[in-house]
Structures are given as C-alpha cells and as structure tokens.
Design a protein with these regions (language model features):
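Beta-propeller domains with acidic blade repeats across secreted/periplasmic ectodomains
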Residues: 1-201
Length: 201
C-alpha cells in the first residue's frame, strides 16, 4: 500500500467498461501510454487545461514530469486492449475486438479523421479477441522463441498464438508460426474453455 496517494487527473470516461482507458504501458522515453475505445466520452482536467474526447478513442500519451497529455487516433481499431513496445521502442497496438495489430509510430503525429486505410502487422486468421500482447523475452523459453510476438485469445481459441514480426520496408510485417503440416504452432493452447489467459506480460 502506498504511503501517500496524489490525485493527478480526473475525467477518464467510464461509459463502457470494455472501452474505458486501459493497457497502461511505459515507453522507452518514460511516457505513459494508455488506450481507450471509441465508445467513450473523456473529459480530462489537466494542469494545462481541459482535454475533451468524444467517440474518438485511441492512445493517450502522458508525460509524468509535466503532466502534459496528448491523444492520437488509431484508424481501423475500435476497442484497443493491447500495447507493447519492441526493443527499439516501437509500439504495437492491438484491437481487442478484431485482434488486428498495428505499428503506432506513423500514427502518433498528426490526427487522422477516418477509421480505415491502416496496414496491419500480420493476418490474425480471424482469431479474436486480443486481451494483451507481448514480445517474448525470457530465459524460460528456448532461443528460437525469443523476440516472437504473442497475444492472449479466448474466443476462437483458448491460448496464445505466436507470430513473427520483422522489418518490412518502412514498417513491420509478420506471420503466424506454423508446424510442418500447416497447423498453428502456438505458444499455448487448451481445449478447456475455462482456460482464459488475459495478460502475457
């Protein structure tokens, strides 16, 4: 339990608990990134003035030193639940509803008005939802698994599929890992519908 609690900001939307602000992730630059779905109406009060967002969703970026906050939209994503940074500090954002994942850096500057036209990192083969994601990096896994991408899935499968994510021109592209017979080579999979992984981190 904290010795002292300081209330810094108020006004995060709570219209829809599935869309409310979550997926808190610290970037390599020390900023706190947070995701919010589109079915919300946030009315933040900050030391720098109010920030209003109605039905926009996307990623919030907060500087903990100055308490400045900004927001950028994520076209083609509606209910973002997954945020993870690779070793180079490049963010990958995953939509909870569709499990589509996108590279966030090209989106983090100017605002985009539409919700289409985004190239996703890989074909998720209809898997959904994406509850949390991670780049695998652990001494508990063999060398060939290090750096692979995974997310938790609980509807089309109960488990965590594995993907490659590599440089591809000016962005990233990946693919689901397969066995020699073409079947998915998942990190973990269960036939028990009560097995519902949520946060790979």
């Amino acid at each position: 339990k904290a010795d002292q609690v300081v209330h810094l900001m108020d006004g995060w939307a709570s219209d829809d608990t599935h869309h409310t602000c979550g997926a808190f992730e610290w970037s390599h630059s020390g900023k706190l990134h947070m995701l919010e779905g589109i079915a919300t109406s946030t009315t933040l009060e900050t030391p720098w003035g109010p920030h209003r967002s109605q039905g926009a969703g996307g990623a919030y970026v907060m500087d903990p030193r100055s308490l400045k906050i900004r927001q950028f939209a994520l076209p083609g994503q509606y209910n973002m639940w997954c945020y993870v940074f690779n070793g180079w500090g490049q963010g990958i954002v995953g939509d909870g509803t569709t499990a589509n994942h996108a590279w966030d850096t090209p989106l983090s500057g100017a605002q985009f008005g539409g919700r289409t036209g985004l190239n996703f990192v890989f074909n998720n083969e209809g898997m959904r939802p994406a509850l949390g994601s991670e780049f695998l990096s652990s001494r508990n896994f063999p060398d060939e698994v290090q750096g692979q991408f995974t997310y938790a899935c609980v509807i089309n499968m109960n488990g965590m599929p594995r993907f490659t994510v590599n440089d591809n021109g000016g962005g990233y592209a990946g693919a689901r890992l397969k066995n020699a017979d073409g079947s998915p080579d998942d990190l973990i999979r269960s036939t028990d519908k009560h097995f519902r992984p949520a946060d790979p981190q």
